[in-house]
């Protein structure tokens, strides 16, 4: 079965139909929509993204697949070869070191030979949309890609030369010579190649470059955090510039750096952990042993008269909570990401993908963590896309985009449904468990708790 995407309209035709629209000033380019047209368990699904988005559903529903989709777009935005970007380039550090879950082959839906993804980025230039088709039969390549700004096509691909690994690319140019066409390598994201291929000699070309820069900036700083408590319990080497790994295995080294570099953030982290702890917690610390090359560090919870509990003895839930809180309260400076350093900090935004945020935590504890996230994401420099098994921790919290994820029993495809705020209020007299499972049961489009559940497509 061959996977194809609709053919993009000619640039000239698209340009004639566009009318200028006023766009409010946006300081940081922001991913506001993820389109999963054909990716793993998804078909034609759309995930809206707010500063704080919670995707919930049972294990196997496809929540992790949605996080993987945004991770794949982020990897492609770095401009490396597609296969190595998704299968991993090796080494210990960097966003491309390890493969995406399942590698490139695992991203392709069963029985298909292509990945089709897209996103929308709100920027100071307007709404930038990217759509990309990656074919995996024969040579792994970009089969189709388009970049638009407020509906105007700025870049689109055409015919391919499979033998030479090239794809004809046309980009907008408002000079008398018309749009520019050139064959570009099809082994990496075309949009990521534009800054090196477009001269910027005309107003139209500068518009293309600006839109591409806004999109790439928004996608590059995506960090997927899936803490592995077993890996967090070991003594680690001190690192003056420690950056947290996706597994949080080096969290003790990161805490040691944070404690000495920023007492203010350290105090905020302590308050966040104290708010979620089920017992009085006096402080956080980092134990040390050995000297010189043998010096090692271990995070410690100070429980007062109960003593000091090291990370090697702490519960899975508390270790995961510590890792999530540390990332939310410190930002990209201590994460193993490849930031767009050419862009000022004030114009960049971190997107944190939090896998199974509530694992090992009670509903109240997960709720405390979400309240921290709501406070932090309100400042515009961090956005959070988190997954939960049950929605209980997010119910009643203002400012949370709540989306249900489930499988279609007929097709097996993952479905996404946005839960309207009015539908989150539990009906009087229902049990706590029923309230937590509020949006499951009736089919799409029915009314729950007085509000409609909006179907986001298959």
Task: Give, region by region, the residue ranges found by the protein language model.
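Short loop immediately C-terminal to the Walker-B catalytic DE motif
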Residues: 357-359
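Phosphate-binding glycine-rich loops of NTP-binding sites
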Residues: 51-93, 248-249, 317, 321-330, ...
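N-terminal pre-Walker A segment at the start of P-loop NTPase domains
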Residues: 2-43
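C-terminal lobe/lid and adjacent interdomain/linker elements of RecA-like ASCE P-loop ATPase modules
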Residues: 2-7, 12, 18, 367-458
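Conserved P-loop NTP-binding catalytic core
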Residues: 68-139
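GG-anchored amphipathic helix commonly corresponding to the ABC/SMC/Rad50 NBD signature/C-loop
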Residues: 303-305, 311-354, 364-368
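Extended helical coiled-coil dimerization/tether regions that scaffold
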Residues: 6, 250-313, 457
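Electropositive, glycine-dotted interaction segments
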Residues: 127-267, 271
């Amino acid at each position: 079965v061959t996977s194809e995407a609709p053919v993009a309209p000619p640039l000239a035709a698209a340009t004639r139909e566009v009318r200028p629209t006023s766009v409010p000033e946006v300081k940081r380019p922001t991913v506001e929509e993820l389109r999963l047209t054909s990716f793993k368990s998804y078909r034609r699904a759309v995930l809206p993204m707010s500063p704080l988005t919670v995707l919930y559903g049972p294990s196997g529903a496809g929540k992790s697949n949605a996080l993987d989709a945004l991770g794949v777009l982020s990897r492609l935005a770095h401009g490396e070869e597609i296969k190595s970007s998704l299968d991993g380039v090796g080494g210990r550090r960097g966003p491309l070191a390890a493969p995406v879950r399942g590698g490139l082959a695992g991203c392709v839906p069963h029985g298909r030979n292509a990945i089709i993804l897209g996103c929308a980025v709100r920027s100071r230039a307007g709404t930038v949309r990217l759509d990309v088709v990656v074919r995996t039969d024969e040579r792994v390549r970009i089969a189709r890609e388009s970049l638009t700004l407020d509906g105007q096509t700025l870049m689109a691909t055409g015919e391919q030369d499979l033998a030479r690994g090239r794809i004809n690319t046309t980009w907008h140019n408002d000079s008398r010579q018309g749009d520019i066409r050139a064959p570009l390598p099809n082994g990496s994201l075309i949009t990521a190649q534009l800054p090196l291929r477009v001269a910027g000699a005309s107003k139209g070309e500068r518009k293309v470059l600006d839109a591409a820069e806004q999109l790439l900036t928004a996608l590059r700083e995506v960090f997927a955090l899936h803490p592995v408590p077993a890996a967090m319990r070991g003594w680690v080497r001190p690192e003056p510039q420690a950056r947290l790994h996706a597994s949080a295995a080096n969290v003790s080294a990161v805490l040691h750096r944070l404690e000495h570099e920023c007492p203010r953030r350290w105090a905020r982290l302590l308050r966040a952990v104290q708010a979620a702890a089920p017992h009085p917690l006096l402080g956080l610390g980092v134990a040390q042993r050995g000297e010189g090359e043998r010096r090692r560090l271990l995070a410690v919870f100070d429980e007062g008269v109960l003593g000091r509990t090291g990370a090697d003895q702490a519960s899975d839930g508390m270790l995961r909570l510590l890792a999530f809180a540390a990332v939310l309260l410190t930002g990209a400076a201590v994460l193993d990401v490849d930031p767009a350093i050419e862009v000022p900090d004030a114009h960049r935004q971190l997107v944190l993908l939090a896998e199974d945020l509530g694992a090992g935590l009670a509903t109240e504890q997960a709720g405390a963590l979400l309240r921290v996230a709501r406070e932090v994401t309100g400042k515009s420099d961090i956005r959070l896309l988190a997954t939960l098994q049950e929605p209980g921790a997010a119910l009643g919290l203002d400012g949370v985009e709540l989306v249900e994820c489930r499988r279609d029993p007929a097709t097996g495809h993952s479905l996404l449904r946005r839960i309207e705020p009015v539908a989150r209020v539990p009906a009087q007299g229902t049990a706590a468990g029923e309230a937590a499972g509020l949006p499951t049961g009736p089919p799409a489009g029915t009314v729950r708790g007085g509000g409609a559940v909006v179907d986001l497509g298959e």
